[in-house]
Each structure stands twice: as structure tokens, then as C-alpha cells.
Amino acid sequence: MKNTCVKFFVALLLFALPVAAFAQNTFKVTGKVYDAQTHEPIIGAGVMMKASNIGTITDLDGNYEITVNDTKGILVVSAIGYEPMEMLIGKKAVINFPLVQDVESLEDAVVVGYGTQKKATITGSLTTANMTDVAKSTAPTLSNALGGVVPGIISRQRSGEPGNDAAVLQIRGVGTWVNSSPLVLVDGIERSLNYVNPEEIESFSVLKDASATAVYGMRGANGVILITTKKGKAGKVKVTFRTEATNLHGLRFPEYIEGYEFANLMNEACTVSGVALPWTDEQIEKFRDGSDPYLYPNVDWTNEVLKKDAFQTTNTLSVTGGNETVRYYVSLGYMSTSGLWKEDPSFGYSTNARSQRYNFRSNVDINLHKNFSISLGLAEIVRENDFPGYGAQDIFFQLKRVSPIAYPIENPDGSFGGATTSYLNVSPYVMVTNGGFIKYTHTSTQATFGAKWDLGDLITPGLQLEGNYSFDHNYNHNVVRRKDPLIKQYVGDDPVTGEGRYNLVREETAMGYSWGADSNRAYYLDLRLNYNRTFNEHTVGAMFMFNRREYINYAAGNSTAALPYRRQGIAGRITYNYAQRYLFDVNFGYNGSENFAKGQRYGFFPAVSAGWVPSEEKWWNVNWFNHLKIRGSYGMVGNDSIGSDRFGYLSTVNKAAAGYLYGQSQSVINGMAEDQIGADNLSWEVARKTDVGIDMEFANRIVRISADYFYEYRDKILLQRAAMPDIFGAAWEQTPYANIGIMTNQGVDGQIEITNTTKKGFYYSIRGNFTYAKNTIVEDDTAKPAEPYMDTRGNVAGLPLGYVALGLFQSQDEIDNSPKQELGTYTVGDIKYKDLNGDGYINSNDRTFIGYPRHPLFMYGFGFTFGYKGFDLSLNFTGAGLTSILIDAESMWPFSLDYPAYNVMREYYDNRFVPGAADNSKAKYPVVHAGTSSNNYQISTQYLRNASYLKLKTAEFGYNFQPKVINKLKIESLRLFLNGNNLLCFDGIKLVDPESDHLGSSSYPTQRGITVGLQVGF
């Protein structure tokens, strides 16, 4: 018995030893799990000790506490939508986990046309933008932040003027002449892209092929952009405030020559033309030394009207929270961007440009029943744009018209200088500072109501009924307060009285007042039936819907334009996949538009797509190759954007045509005549699109690659008939429209991303994307030209027709031994052209299509992000290629059109052909003439430049304060950052921004922005 008791206690002791040992070696680890970018806490994240059953989850503040027993153990943290992260426990009592968002995880739901799908099962071509990268751009309009960020999007910012700085966007290039802009939907409703505050955006999808856009039918040919705004999430109330202060520095102002150089150039022109010189050396010296600034002025007009720096501020306050029943998201935003125009401080009003935007958005979701929920979205956008009394284009035109010696800013008597020549009578300075101001106000009220009814319990699992209704009201109001100060032309002092002599140019007028207003409304309704269900390894889905949109312009100028614009139709989708291995989709849209005649209003647009995922096959055992999907699609989509003219199938009558004199009073009685000739068979464009793509993920999904080849054949493009015989008997503008245009468009796009977080918490992301899209004209109804190289067919749309320049004539012998140029008189130093048809003469038959189109055929972007212990650095580059720009004619033709009035740019002066110079072989511009030189005033490769560029578009360095600091401050997150926008540009132009419309002096400069910002969460 005694031995038995001893054995029992020994056994009990041996059993207890491991337990005691565990108890003695256990210790607690605490910490916080938060978003690496926003520093907001992550609720419900799983925290596990690797290779054990020890685990916990984070609370509402993202905090966790776990008891572990091994300093060599590894903690693994995972959360939905984030990449998992591991850290060695060691002897640390506090371990924080900054999780990185899992960009487009295969299990994530991606927004598609009228629904969502798992990324793993998508067979169409679509891309989602990383809004974290987009938000790093301080551009005041969203469209300017997209180029080089999203594959498939080609963008160009034509101007930097506040309020008029939106970029032109195309998806996969240009496939039509009429309207190549994509359809933009915000929360499923057709709304403006540039009025959305980027901080309000939850997801941004770009639909590119027919499979992705077929449900939009005759609106889907140009691609679709889907923006989904943020919604509330269950949890405690979160308040986020973000503020930015930006210094904007103007880039590449137009640079003109000084007064004495202008006078010298006038003398040089007269020497070349063999006429008397207008200026003596003594007079030229007065322009240089400023000894007589009224009769011999030297005005730098650019410096007088443009300042170097401006200011921008952006602020957003958002509140989100709720529970399982009610969830809400509310956001308030304010943005203000000032312009670069100088002002007269003596006025009580501003003449500078300024753009202000006020944003309010509220999204509320309510679960009324476990199977029934409703949503209400409200938004109010107010945008105020202020400009000088004269528009920017007029001001920049005047900058190149008024020379530095034309007249002084002010005359001796204090009046403003001017000239009696009509287009020179007002100076750029007066236009900017003393011409009054214009104020535009746009107000948009948006309301969206939605309801979802889960019919799973009532009919069958996976069935859902959904409906949406929206109402948008837009109101525009403008006020014009123009004024004209007293303007005189000073012609010197009276030799007898000594008083100044003047020619009156313009009397002073009081500030005027005029205003205008217009408004419009849009209604949208849709009703959808959704079905999604999995049977073992078979997953099927379906969607069928009806939608209708009506738009009314309440300020229409005539009864036709006042009629409502209506579109309606049905759309559907069927999806099937087997074990996420074999994928198949069918999409269609059947839409109608009242733009066309009865019998022509409705069209059917189907598309099919399929995919195969070899990495899901049982025989796939390539561990480092995590995912491979091959997909393809083919379908038809349409474009019913036929311009501003409505009802092109109807003929119109001009009631104010030429008439006759009637009666004794000889009153004019107007006649009636046929006006626009209608065509009752008009229809929409049809684009037949093919897409083949591949998606890959490697190295534990650290590396992601996707690429697509696309081809589009678009016919029935609406064009006004051009090749009409004279016997037709009507003016060109009366000729009917017809669906006769044909264009093809093909190319490739793709992206790569390498993202990882090391065990020590170092985060890095390397990414790149590209888009190449080239169109070809097949038919545009133009007449067959005299020479085959002048035919538009077979060329890219948008190419300029011009001469091929062979440089400048260097000698008379070269002129004598060259083909005769019939474009005007020419001499040594003038442009030499190529004789394309070899007939010995240079004339209009020697023109061909030159360069590349203004929109780039190739666009790309790449970037880097690094983060460690709260610090992060992000760089994003954007580039474009295969694009050309023509030098603005009036900027580069010296004394353009009217010697000697027009200004002369520094670029021309420093690179011109100089008579008598030792070497003119490197001269880029022709010799100057005292008068017009039509030989040189031709569109040619001499004035064509390569507009390719690479920009450091954004750079941001930031610090997210660590949990122990923000806990002391009793806040959830705190981030400080320094941001740069448009920091560097590598290109061969240097005169203007390479994205501008013209290479010269008529574009408002873009700006470099340096921003200091703060984001705090409560």
C-alpha cells in the first residue's frame, strides 16, 4: 500500500512538471493591429501563435492581449482585406502590427457593371485603382491623378487654370471621331468625375472590354469608370480629419524677348526684305537702358500679369460608425485653389482666378429586417470658379500680340497705355488687373435611394431583389462684372507747350453687371433580380435588370432642346464557374435611345467571356507559382453619343431664309428654305471588341502580373457626309449624317506589382503599368486625294496634314538646285520642303500626315513605396510617348500676320537663322522677314515636336505616430506628411508643359505643388 501511494505521487509529480514549467514560462504580449497607411485600428483581426492553438482577436480599438510560452515563437496576424503579417516574439512585451492592405485579393469582391464579383472568377478586362496612390496626388481634380496609375487610362491635362484644369480621359485610346469619353458612374449613377472628393471614394473600377461593359449597351463602347463612395461600418464612431496646405509654383511661363532685341529684330527683318531700317542705334539703346520708358518702353508683359506662386488648401472631415442595424458615413470637404494672375491691390475685389469646392456626402444603410435593407445617399457639391474679366485664352493671346515696345503700362498722366490698332488697344496688364471679374457657381444636389430584399427564405437561397432610384438637380449661375479703364496712346510731348500728346483709345466705363443661369435635372430608376449560389463545386450567378434615365434641360434655347432626353433598356448577366477553375460569363444589354427614329431606337449588345485557371487544377504543383488565369472575351457594345444635334433623322426648315421686299414700305419678308437634311436610318456606333488576357501571382502572392491584348473594330460611326457631288444642290453644312465611319483600335495594357512586408516590419511596394493603343482609319467618307500619301485611310486619327521640312536653305545655290516651292516667295534662311510626288514643284499635293496625334498612343507609370516603423516614402512616375505637338503658329512666326505688332518668343530669337552668321546649320527657325512669309507659315515638321515625357508626378514622405504616442494623446491615429506634385518633368520641349494643347504661349501654366498635411483619427 505504501509503495502504491509513492508511485501515485511520483506519477502525479511527473504529470504536473510540464504544467508547472508552462506556468513558469508563460508571459503576456500586448499590442495594436492597425492599417499601415491610415493608422486606423483594425477590429476583429486574428492574432495566433504559429503552430499552436493559442490565439485571440483585436477589440474595437485594435488592441489585443495574448499569453504565450516561447520567446522563439512567432505571432501571426491576419484580417480580411489585409496581407497576413508575422513577427518573432522574442523578449518584447509589446508588439504592434501595421498591416498592409491586400490589393485585390482573389477573394475580394470587385465592383463590376451592376454588381460585384470575386476577382478570382472575373473573366472580363477590368482594373481597380489603388486609392491610396491616387490620394497622394494633390491635384484639385480627380482626373489629373489617374494618368499612369491605372492601366488602360490615357489622360492629358491641357491647362493648369483653376476651374478649367480637368484632364481629358480615354480608356484604351480613341476609337471614334464623335465622342471618345468613357461613361462615368458614381454609385451607379451618371455623374461628373471631377466633382467627387477623392477622400470619399471606396473603390474605383475601370471596365475595358465588351464582357465588362456589354450591360451598358449603347453607352459602353468607350469604356466605363465606376466610382463607389464610402459606406459606414459597424463599430464605434470614427472621426477622421485631414488637412493640406499647398504652395503652387507656376512652371514654364511664356518667355518673350526684350525691347531692344525686338527693335534689333525689326531692323534685321528690314535688311532681309530690303527696306529702310526703322530704328537707329541710339533709339535701340534707349529701349535697353530705360532712359525714356514712355516713348521707348521695354515691358515684360509676362512678368506684369503672372506671379510665380499661388496657394491651395484641402480639408476633409468624415464620421463613420454604426451597428448591425444602422451604419453611416458622413463627409464634409472644402478645397480652394488660387490662380497665378496678379491683382491691383487698390480694388475691393479680386481679379485673380480661384476655384473653390464644397463637398457634403452622407451614406446611410439600415437593416429593417434580416432579409430586407435600405440605403440612402445624399450629396451636395458647390463649386465656385472666379476668373479675370477677360478669359485666360484671350489674355494669353494678347501676351503674344503686344510687343515689349508697343506702349508702356501707364502713360505719363497715369492713364493706361494702348494702341489704336483694334487688337492692340488693350494691354494684357489691363485685361488681368483692371478688366473686372467673372464668377461661375455650380451647385449639384444628388439623392440616391436603394433597397435590397433577400428572397432566400421566401423563394430560394441566393435570390435577391434590388431597386435604386436617384434624383440629381444641377444649377449653374454666372455673374460678369466687366469694366474698361481709360486707355490712351502716348505720342510724345508738344514741342511748344511741353504737354503730353495722346490719341484716345478707349473711354473709361463703369463696372457693368450681367448674369445668366440654367438648371437641369436627371432621374434614374433600376430594378434588378440577382441570383448567386454554390452547389458543391459549381457556382452559378445571374442578374437581370430594367433601367431608365431621363434628363431635362430647363434652360434650353429652343423647344427641341427642351424635350427630355430619355434612355431605357434591360441588361443581364449569367456566370458559371466550376471549382474556380473553369469560368464562363454571358452579358448583354438591350437599350433604346430617343435620338433615333422608330424602328432604329433599340439595339442588342451581347458579349461572352471565358477563363481557365490552371493553378486550380489538381495536377498543378508549382509552389512558387500561386495563381495563373487565362481569359478571353468577345462582344458588341455601342455608342449613341452623336453630338449636340438631336433627332438627326428629322429634316429641318429655316424660317429666316432669304426673302423679298414687300409693298410700298418695302418690308422684308423672310422666306423658308430646307435646312438640315435628315436621315431616318441613323443608328448608334457598334464596336466589336476582342480581348485576351492573363493574370499571374508568384512567390506567395508577393508578385502580381496581368496583361491584355485588345482589338476593336468599330463601324457605323456617325459622320456628316463629306464626299457629296456638287449636283447634290445643298451647302456642305446641310448634308445629312450617316453611319459610314469605320475605325480599328488595338493594343496592349498591363501592370505588375511587387508587395511584401518582412518579419521585421519593413514594407515595400514596387509597381508599374502601361497602355499602348493605336487606331487606324478604315473609312471616313473623305474624297480620294490627289496623292495616296494624303489619304486619311490607313492613318491614325488626329494626325496633322503638313509638309516634310528638310531644314533651312543655307545658300542661293541650294535654292537654285532644289524643286520650286510655290508656297510664296522665299530666300536663303527660309524653310526647305520635300517634294513627295517628285514633280519638281512644292505645292499642296506634297503634304502628308506627319508625327503622332496629340493624344499619346503610349502611357505608362511606375512607383515605389517603402515603410518602416511608422515612416513611409512613396514615389510615383507618369510618362507618355508616341505623341506630337505643333508649335503655336502665332508664337513662332516672328511678327506674325502684322509686322511689327506681334511679340516674339525667346525660343525663336535664340534659335533663328541669322543672316551673315558664320554657321546657321543648327538654326531651328527660318530667317525673319518684314511682312508675312507664307512659305514659312505652313504646317510642317519644322514646327513639330516630340511631346513624350516622364514626370515625377507625386512624392510623399510621411510618419504615422506609434500607438504608445497616440494612446497618450487619446486619439486613434496621427499622420504627418510632406507631399510634392509635378516635381520633375523630363522632356525635349521645355517651353510649355508637354501635355498642353499648343507648344507656344497660349496655355495657362501648370504648377508644382509642395504640400504639408496632417491626418488625425479619433
Regions found by a protein language model. Name each.
Residues 41, 53, 83-86, 190, ...:
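Short, solvent-exposed loop/turn motifs
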Residues 854-886:
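Glycine-rich, aromatic-lined ligand/substrate-binding cores of catalytic
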